[in-house]
């Protein structure tokens, strides 16, 4: 079982979404990014998750020196199909594994997701991008 699979149901059970996990060399830093459907992540949210995960990681005998829990930030990564659905109409920066029309990097508006294919409006052109071809996708913050 992966660490993501271990933590996701616990975090979901507390009313949050596990966005991402970053690990440095084994046994060092474990960084967990959380979000929630309504509102912003607060310091109290991070403390509650951190306290709960500390106990879970101890029980599961997961070795780490430092645990950090935070929000994913304004430029939130988009990883799952549900992320793209949730942020339809928002602007995103997309990097592909395999080039599309000779290009791997795109900036555009998320239009829709059907059958694991994302439609992105990039400079007025509607691009069809298979989700499995995404290397990286992040929201572009509204300032």
UniProtKB/Swiss-Prot annotation:
SUPFAM superfamilies: YhbC-like, C-terminal domain (SSF74942), YhbC-like, N-terminal domain (SSF75420). Pfam families: DUF150_C (PF17384), RimP_N (PF02576). Signal peptide: none annotated. Keywords: Cytoplasm, Ribosome biogenesis. It comes from the Bacteria. Disulfide bonds: none annotated. One of its GO terms (cellular component) is cytosol. The keyword Hydrolase does not apply. PANTHER family: RIBOSOME MATURATION FACTOR RIMP. This is Ribosome maturation factor RimP. The gene is rimP.
């Amino acid at each position: 079982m992966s660490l993501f699979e271990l933590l996701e149901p616990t975090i979901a059970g507390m009313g949050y979404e596990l966005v991402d996990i970053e690990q440095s060399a084994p046994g060092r830093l474990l960084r967990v990014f959380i979000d929630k459907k309504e509102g912003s992540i607060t310091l109290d949210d991070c403390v509650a998750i951190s306290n709960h995960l500390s106990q879970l990681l101890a029980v599961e005998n997961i070795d780490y020196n430092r645990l950090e829990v935070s929000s994913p930030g304004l430029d939130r990564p988009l990883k799952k199909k549900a992320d793209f659905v949730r942020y339809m109409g928002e602007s995103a920066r997309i990097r592909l594994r395999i080039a599309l029309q000779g290009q791997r990097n795109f900036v555009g508006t998320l239009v829709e997701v059907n059958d694991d294919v994302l439609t992105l409006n990039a400079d007025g052109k509607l691009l069809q991008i298979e989700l499995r071809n995404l290397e990286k996708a992040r929201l572009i913050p509204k300032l």
